[in-house]
C-alpha cells in the first residue's frame, strides 16, 4: 500500500522528453505511474508510443504523445491533449531537451567564441523555451484546481558547476532553475510547487565514454542510474513535498562538493 504522503492515485502527469528507453524521462514516468498517477509521456518522435506501450503492458495508465516543444503552440496543444484525455493535469515534469555531450563542437557544445548564434538559440529553445512553454500552458489548469507540481530537469552543469565548451547548455540549464524559482514564488499561494532536479553523470544510452569515465571519479565511483534521478523527481511531485518549492535538488553522488579527486 502506498503511504498517503506519496500516493498519486487520481492525479494526472505529463512527462516530456520521455522517448528514450534508458533516459530520465521514461524513468520518471514509470516512477509516477508506480505511485498511482495516470501519465502522458511525450517526445519528438513516434518511439514515445513504444514507451507508452511498455508502461501500459506493465499495468499502468499511460498514453503517448508527439510534440516539438520548441514551438509554443505545440506545447499548448500537448497540454490540451493531456487535459482532454485525463480531464485533469496535476503534474508536469519538464525533461525535454538536449543532454550535454561533453565534447566541443557537438550538439550545443562550444565556448562563446566557437558557438554561433543559431546554435545558441537552438540550445535555449530545446532546454529552456520548451520548459517555459509547457509550464505556462499548464499553470492555469493547476491554479484552477488549487494543486500542482512542476519539476524542471536541469543539470549540475550551469546551476552548480561549469564544464568547458558548454556555454549554451550551461546557460539554458541555469535558466531552468531560475525559472523554477520565479514560478515557485509567483504561484505558491495557488497550491502549486515548482522545483528543479540537477543530475550529474547519468548512465543512460547516450552516455559517452568520457562521461562514463567522469562518473567513476565521483565520490561514489559510478554514474547515477536514471531511476535514481527519477526517485527525486517523483518525490517532488507527491503530497509529502507540499512545502518544498523553489528548490534545486542535486543528484550527483556528492561530485559537486568533493574537493579532491582520487
PLM ranges: what are they?
Residues 2-4, 160, 234, 245-262:
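Short C-terminal tail/terminal secondary-structure segment
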Residues 98, 112-132, 147, 151, ...:
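Catalytic Tyr-X3-Lys loop
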Residues 66-78, 117, 227-228:
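The beta1-alpha1 cofactor-binding region of Rossmann-like NAD(H)/NADP(H)-dependent oxidoreductases
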Residues 135-136, 181:
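A short, exposed helix-loop element centered on a Lys and neighboring polar residues
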